[in-house]
Each structure stands twice: as structure tokens, then as C-alpha cells.
Amino acid sequence: EGEATLLPVLGSGIQLYVAWMLYFYTSVALRENVLVMNGSNIRAWWMQHHYISIVVGLLMLTMPVESDAFKHFGEGMLLFNIMQGLVMILQTYYQRRRLYTRIALGKSSKMDVASADSSAASGQMLLFPVLFLLQAYQLYMGLIMIVYHAGALASPEGWLDEFPQSSDLRSSRTVFFCGVFFIVLGLGNFFSTLATLNAK
């Protein structure tokens, strides 16, 4: 009969992860809006980043897990999220080290944010190249998604009429738009990181 596969389980796992990321970015966007209203100085890009990420999450949740486009997109997305997780661990390590140093110097308390001064630290020499590498991969992934799925966008089939359930047009179009958003996110992250680096 049919071959046993982990794809439905893996695809469902990815969709659960995307649902969690959707919740995460929604809660962060709400929190940052409150912080801005209370006078925090948060770069406008990061607020926009979270709203764009919410849109990407919603798009990803609409894709059927058994489609070829989802399989193609899911592999790259998993690798990107693993890399993103490693960068978050590095950022946390860096921030904790900075805060520990500032507490030891008597410049901060445990509840302060570690980036209060503009002096560069040695941990940035590792953090920034890894961030740039992640952003380059995000741009590459967005470009690949656009190139491989642009044909589905150009196809007149299925825009105003019904198309067969076996067709992968809807998923391919979704992946195309996710690719566009990935490029926007990658470029925004890159320029925001450069602005932060120049400010230090």
C-alpha cells in the first residue's frame, strides 16, 4: 500500500511551532507597544518586524502540511529556526555577561537592561558576525522561495476560479509571499543591526 512517513507528524509539529511563534510575536508586539507608550526607546523597525512576523506566521498556518511547497519550505524554515535559536542563546549569554559586569561595577541593578551604555564589549565580536550570517541565510532563503515559486504566482489558474485540490498552487503562492516577507525581514534586520553597531 502506502509507505509510512513522518511527514504529517513533522508538518503538524512545524505548524504547532508556527502557532507558538505567532503567539510569541503577538505578545512581544503588545508588550513593546506598552513600553513605547511608557517612554521606552525601541527602534521602530523592531515593532514593524514583529507585525510582519505575525503576517508570515498566519500565512504559514494556512499551508497544507502535505503539499510539496510546504515540504520544500519546511526544511529551510527548520534550519533557519535552529540557527535563530542558537543566536538567541548567544544574545542571552552576551546580555547576562554585560549585566553581570554592570552590576559588579555598581552601574546597574538586577532589574536593569544591559544595553544602557554605549560601550562595546568583547562578546559583540562573536555576536555580530553570527547575526549577519543568520540575516544572510534569511535573505538567501527568501530569494530561493521567490525563485522556485514565482511560476505559481504568474499562473492564471485558481485566482478567480476553483482549482483541483491536488494542485499545489495555493501553497506555492503562499511560499512566494513568505519569501518576499523573508527578504523584507532580512534587509530590515541587517540595516537595524548596522545602525546598532554604528551607535556603539
Residue ranges, per PLM feature:
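Eukaryotic polytopic
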Residues: 1-200
